[in-house]
Design a protein with these regions (language model features):
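Glycine-rich, highly charged phosphate/nucleotide-binding loops
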Residues: 31-53, 171-181
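N-terminal basic/disordered segments at the start of proteins
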Residues: 1-22
Length: 249
């Protein structure tokens, strides 16, 4: 919501799309044109939103794709529809942080290069990748634990996974974490190492700090390579400059 807040200050009219009512909470106090709630996960849905905006007003000056770097299906879909409709699109790519104290892995099977037998490993991943990572870590003889966020999809997926039911925690953070809950889980389960994603966001930074301070290993699942032929930026300042350069063309 930082981008939306800053763009409003610059005088832009903003429509925001979020996947759930919960995700809309940070935006509700902002003076937005509209908050669209529900996953825009198909070409038809994205096309419909863009065309509706054109029918009811002047349409969107630009679509800004702020989706998660591991949500690999949505960016190509947005890009395809925007190209078809001649809709300007800018993709925000989170900066990649320095990972000097972490091990970078391209895929979960790369964990096989490390001695994990009888080690307690905490999976701090998106729930969609939980079962795959669980299979590899368990297969290497690790004692596997996980933490997931308190939303219906995550709870359903972890309950249907093969993880031992006493080995996961459901977290319901009300704001950015200060790392104390994460440290408490590490102490409770006597964790030797954490697996998380190279997301480039607050969560990755948090795990880097927590693992460093507690002297445990951290494995980062490498971020998917960015999509070619999509106009992308990696900071708010560059976004503003790009929008201004488009508007004077």
């Amino acid at each position: 919501h930082v981008f939306a807040k800053s763009l409003l200050k610059e005088g832009w009219k903003i429509t925001v799309s979020v996947v759930s009512s919960r995700a809309s909470i940070p935006y509700q106090k902002l003076n937005l044109d509209k908050i669209l709630i529900g996953a825009l996960n198909t070409e038809e849905k994205i096309r419909s939103v863009i065309l509706n905006a054109r029918n009811k007003q002047d349409g969107f000056f630009c679509v800004v794709d702020l989706t998660h770097p591991f949500a690999t299906k949505i960016t190509p879909t947005i890009s395809k529809v925007c190209k078809e409709l001649d809709q300007k699109l800018i993709r925000y790519e989170r900066p990649i942080d320095n990972i000097s104290k972490a091990f970078l892995i391209k895929k979960f099977s790369d964990l096989g290069s490390y001695e994990l037998k009888n080690k307690s490993i905490l999976l701090a991943l998106g729930v969609r990748q939980l079962q795959e990572s669980l299979i590899f870590a368990s297969g290497l003889g690790a004692h596997v634990y996980a933490r997931v966020l308190a939303n219906p999809e995550s709870i359903k997926k972890i309950l249907s996974s093969s993880i031992i039911k006493t080995n996961f925690a459901i977290l319901n953070p009300l704001g950015p974490s200060d790392g104390e809950i994460e440290k408490a889980l590490i102490r409770k389960w006597n964790i030797d190492g954490v697996v998380c994603r190279q997301s480039g966001g607050r969560t990755e930074k948090l795990w880097q700090q927590v693992c460093l301070s507690m002297g445990i290993d951290l494995w980062l699942l490498e971020r998917p390579s960015k999509l070619q032929h999509v106009d992308s930026i990696d900071s708010y300042e560059k976004l503003i400059n790009r929008l201004q350069s488009i508007s004077v063309k």
